[in-house]
Every structure is written in structure tokens, then in C-alpha cells.
């Protein structure tokens, strides 16, 4: 098969980016051709990745490429621009179009609650050859749009293999981890919806109980400078490491090493990092968004006291890690099966 993945391509290594790259690498390892088209403003030079500078350039590229499947990856809000792109792809002859919809919070949003057959969104979605929902709530929404069951799959957006515990961590992270116990980790984009300021403030409470505790914040985004200022203003600034973006393999190794993964959010869907941590057997403390998988310690939104209490309880419990037994690739195999079964 010849496939093109369309969506945000790393960096940064957010959840959608991670899933897109995982599918691409899996397909290439299994003898398929898979390029990628980056859809945001960042311009890079990754091999096999196209970086169109405008909608016109993107349209010309899609017309020119001779492929079997166009696989779109949408997260966040569903804009008219994205809807138009999906419609355009369905009009191209000789190609199948698949959409992975990653925005777990969209079904409960005002726009998501208006899902219906007679909407423009419904018209476009019914034209797609395949739709991948990353959770059951999204799948139910697409059924309201009229997507036929034989074209709809629920496939979790993560794939992970156990990292080698002997793999060295970057010196800066290794030094920080060696100096702090418990070692707490948060992984995600540095954006307002991830409520990272709450974690920084909660470290004051956590340090009262665990004086050597440390928090590493991994990711990139628009709040980087303001978070640096917030951290620098704290008397415990040396206990927080704003690391920056990190390659996925290193991130998984850090997840394996940490005492707990924190996922505080104001708005969130089905988090890839949460799924990865659960697969590795790493304890996870996350804001309750109504759609978290089993096995997490849930806390209310923006609740500093409950976050501190949860860290204390999880660290004090010290339960043994229980990684999952499968190879972590079933979700990628499910995507490949969907490609083969497209009508």
C-alpha cells in the first residue's frame, strides 16, 4: 500500500504527532510506503515529510501524489479549514480517505452536542471511507453524524513497546532524577489547557511531605517562557525542571523511571501519555475528565490540595509495577486492518 499521513508532525511530540509517527513507522517496517504531510506552520526537513506553505500548495501536492490512502489526523477544534480539507480529499479520484479524530473532549463541547445527520459535518464525514474514533464517546458522535458502522472503528491512539531500562537518559534529566526522590514527571504540550501552573504551585505542598521531591515537565509550547518565570519565582525552583521537548523513545524511558506521571488538565481527551504510562505500569495521577481509562488516581479539576494528597498516597503506597503483557502494537495492527478492509 501507498499511504500518506496528514497532520501535525513532530516537533513537538504531542499525542497526535506521536500516533501519526507510530503508524507511519509501523507501515514502513511492514513493507508499505508511507509519507507524511505536515499541516501546521512549523517548517522542518524530516525525510519523507512534505511541508506545504499554503492551502493551494497542499491541494496541488495532494493532486500530484499517487497513493492509495490519505489518512487525516484531526485534534482539538474541528474548523471549517479542516472540514474543507477532508471534503477535498474525498473528491480526489483513485484514493481512499481515512480520518482519525483525536479530540476526546469534542463530543461534549457545544459544537459536538449538535452532531446530526443534516449538518455539513455529517455530509463530509459520511463521504469518508474510514473513520477512527479514539474513544467510545467519539464513536457515538460519528454515529449521530450518520457514519455507517462498517466504516467506523474505535482504535486507541497509542502504541508502545517496553523501553530498555539500561538505555541512558540525557545527562540533564539523569542528574535531576538522581537528586530528587520521588521523581514526578509530566508529559504534554506547554499550553493553557494542561494546567501546568497547578503542578508548579502544588510542589510547595509536596515538598513539605517529600523534601527531596522533583518534578520534570517535558514538552514544548506557547507557555514556555511564562512557566519559566513562574518556576524561577519559587523558593523551590531547583526542584522543578522545565526540560523542553523530548524524543518519544527517551520519554518512554523517563516514564519507566519516574515514580508517578501527572496529567492535570482543564480540557483533555484520551491522552496518549496516560495510555503509555499505564502500559508501562507507571502510576498515573490525572484530572477526572469523565473518560479516563481504569487504573488511574483521579483528582478534581484545578484542585491543588487533592493533587498533593494524591501524590502522597501514590508514592507512599509504593505498589509494584505491572506492565501489560502484550507487545503494545495491537492498535497499529488494527489501523492496518482497517486500511485493507476499506470499501
Where are these regions (language model features)?
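Donor nucleotide-sugar binding/catalytic pocket of nucleotide-sugar-dependent glycosyltransferases
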Residues: 122, 126-167, 269
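Short hydrophobic beta-strand element within catalytic cores of glycosyltransferases
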Residues: 279, 283-286
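Nucleotide-activated donor-binding/catalytic signature segment of Leloir-type glycosyltransferases, i.e.
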Residues: 228-246
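A charged, aromatic-enriched C-terminal amphipathic alpha-helix characteristic of glycosyltransferases
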Residues: 316-343
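Short alpha-helical donor nucleotide-sugar binding micro-motif in glycosyltransferases
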Residues: 245-246, 253-258
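Conserved donor-binding/catalytic core segment of Leloir-type glycosyltransferases
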Residues: 4, 172-194, 200-203
Amino acid at each position: 500500500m501507498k499511504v500518506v499521513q496528514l497532520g501535525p508532525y513532530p516537533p513537538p511530540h504531542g499525542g497526535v504527532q506521536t500516533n501519526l509517527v507510530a503508524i507511519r513507522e509501523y507501515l514502513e517496517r511492514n513493507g508499505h510506503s508511507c509519507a507524511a504531510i505536515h499541516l501546521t506552520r512549523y517548517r522542518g526537513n524530516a525525510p519523507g515529510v512534505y511541508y506545504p506553505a499554503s492551502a493551494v500548495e497542499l491541494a496541488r501536492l495532494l493532486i500530484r501524489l499517487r497513493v492509495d490512502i490519505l489518512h487525516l489526523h484531526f485534534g482539538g477544534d474541528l474548523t471549517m479549514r479542516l472540514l474543507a480539507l477532508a471534503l477535498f480529499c474525498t473528491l480526489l479520484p483513485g484514493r481512499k480517505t481515512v480520518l482519525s479524530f483525536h479530540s476526546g473532549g469534542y463530543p461534549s463541547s457545544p459544537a459536538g452536542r449538535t452532531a446530526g445527520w443534516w449538518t455539513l459535518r455529517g455530509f463530509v464525514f459520511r463521504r469518508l471511507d474510514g473513520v477512527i474514533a479514539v474513544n467510545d464517546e467519539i464513536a457515538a458522535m460519528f454515529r449521530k453524524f450518520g457514519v455507517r458502522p462498517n466504516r467506523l472503528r474505535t482504535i486507541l491512539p497509542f502504541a508502545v513497546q517496553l523501553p530498555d531500562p539500561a538505555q541512558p537518559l540525557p545527562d540533564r534529566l539523569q542528574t535531576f532524577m538522581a537528586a530528587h526522590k520521588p521523581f514526578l514527571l509530566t508529559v504534554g504540550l506547554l499550553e493553557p489547557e494542561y494546567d501546568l501552573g497547578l503542578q508548579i504551585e502544588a510542589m510547595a505542598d509536596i515538598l513539605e511531605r517529600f523534601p527531596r521531591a522533583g518534578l520534570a515537565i517535558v514538552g514544548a509550547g506557547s507557555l514556555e517562557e511564562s512557566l519559566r518565570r513562574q518556576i524561577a519565582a519559587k523558593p523551590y525552583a531547583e526542584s522543578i525542571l522545565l526540560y523542553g521537548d523530548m524524543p518519544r523513545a527517551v520519554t518512554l524511558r523517563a516514564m519507566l523511571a519516574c515514580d508517578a506521571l501527572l496529567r492535570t488538565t482543564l480540557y483533555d481527551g484520551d491522552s496518549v501519555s496516560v495510555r503509555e504510562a499505564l502500559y508501562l505500569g507507571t502510576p498515573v495521577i490525572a484530572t477526572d475528565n469523565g473518560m479516563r481509562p481504569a487504573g488511574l488516581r483521579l483528582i478534581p479539576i484545578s484542585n491543588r490540595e487533592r493533587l498533593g494528597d494524591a501524590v502522597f498516597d501514590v508514592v507512599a503506597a509504593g505498589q509494584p509495577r505491572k506492565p501489560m503483557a502484550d507487545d503494545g502494537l495491537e492498535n497499529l495492527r488494527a489501523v492496518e486492518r482497517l486500511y485493507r478492509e476499506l470499501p
